[in-house]
A protein has these predicted regions:
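Conserved N-terminal alpha-helix of the aminotransferase class I/II PLP-enzyme fold
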Residues: 19-65, 86-88, 92-93, 98-100
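PLP-dependent aminotransferase-class I/II
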Residues: 104-149
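Glycine-rich loop at the start of a catalytic domain that most often binds anionic cofactors/ligands
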Residues: 71-80, 98
Length: 151
């Protein structure tokens, strides 16, 4: 890994971050339990805090962005639906086809310029419209990412 000046934050990916000593101490000293049984007070506090910050009824902690994308896709789609996403989106390029395996969805890819989607091109990918009957899948989810890994 290339060295960066200490005053810069490396936002390329969460996979290049390293916890500082304070973070390691917090992890070592965290009160933990079985999250499935509701016995992990640290996770419970985190979920409650984030839900409160966002004005939501509840929160859900998942251990990775890939897993959170899988949950989001499954929540907002039905099998046979189509997801519209930028051609180099993380969801399409780096997640091993999880959207298809877990949700039964296909993907319509939108070309971009350095990760920036042209709204006209986006609209072209939403093929199901009045009068199309059942010839095209229902585009039930548009995935917009910021930042783009490849743009």
């Amino acid at each position: 890994m290339e060295s960066k000046p200490s005053h810069l934050i490396d936002l390329r990916s969460d996979t290049v971050t390293q916890p500082c000593e304070g973070m390691r101490d917090a992890m070592r000293n965290a009160e933990v339990g079985d999250d499935v049984n509701g016995d992990d007070p640290t996770v419970i506090r985190l979920q409650e805090k984030v839900a409160e910050m966002l004005g939501k009824e509840a929160g859900l902690f998942v251990p990775s962005g890939t897993m959170s994308n899988a949950v989001a896709v499954r929540t907002h789609t039905q099998p046979g639906d189509e997801i519209v996403a930028e051609e180099y989106s993380h969801l399409y390029v780096y997640e091993g086809g999880g959207y298809a395996a877990l949700s039964g969805c296909s993907m319509a890819l939108v070309p971009s310029s350095n990760g920036i989607i042209d709204p006209v091109e986006l609209r072209k990918r939403i093929r199901k419209s009045k009068g199309s009957r059942s010839h095209y899948p229902n585009a039930s989810l548009i995935c917009i990412e910021n930042t783009s890994n490849r743009g």
